[in-house]
Amino acid sequence: MQKRKAFATLPVTINRISIRRKPGDDRRGILAAGPFRIPCALGRSGTTIFKREGDGATPVAVMAAIEIWYRGGARGDRMARPKSRLPARRVRPGVDGWCDAPRHAAYNRHVRLPFPASAETLARDDRLYDVVVVLDWNYRRRARSRGSAIFFHVARPGYPPTEGCIAVAPSDMTKLAPFLARRTRLVVER
């Protein structure tokens, strides 16, 4: 019953978020979500239909939103828990990571740090992962070296390229999060 009350204050979900490359710059895009048109950063290698681990490209794909990780902050120094219909988990500094070692059984999964194989920390100092939406690229049926940690996250000022993720300004993430649900699909177009 309380879940319904919480959801009653959230707006209608957006089922499709389209991401198109910006003309003249393969590393930037325009994200279209319902009435919103938002600039975004894409991978340093642009987009690709042949995604490989470490190639720096954003996959051309239809990806479901799975869950949100957020940094939070007792002192208010980080973004608060986003309002969203997606499950949300708070990042624990020094504990939460994401495996990017293609040969490890935990490849492209949340892991606890320290981790014996290669893994990136979710508690970054640069604030890019203050809010992270996990996308289902190579997630449900993982294939070695097909790419890991393809997230929808916060962009650096000026929208420099990512390592393959989709990134928006913090204010735009706050604006979009309430519209996200498990049925939301991020569609990266050619």
Annotated model-derived regions:
Residues 1-162, 173-185, 189-190:
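Cell wall/extracellular polymer interaction/catalysis modules
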Residues 165:
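Short cysteine clusters
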